[in-house]
Amino acid sequence: MSRITALLPAYNEETSIGSVVLCTRKYADRVIVIDDGSIDRTAEVAALAGAEVLRHPQNRGKGAALKTGFESL
């Protein structure tokens, strides 16, 4: 059986990332949120919802966030 990993790049999404992670966990075995330099609680909320969290210290853009996620696999 194959395993599914979802990569979710995020920047200042504390108000929505929790529900996105919870919804995604229904379909994926592993959810990784790449916090792209957020200045809010995005990383904390994502972790509380059950995601693994990778962090960029500053915003580098969606492409860089996805690259970080793919490199973590």
Language-model features: locations:
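Structured catalytic core of nucleotide-sugar glycosyltransferases
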Residues: 1-73
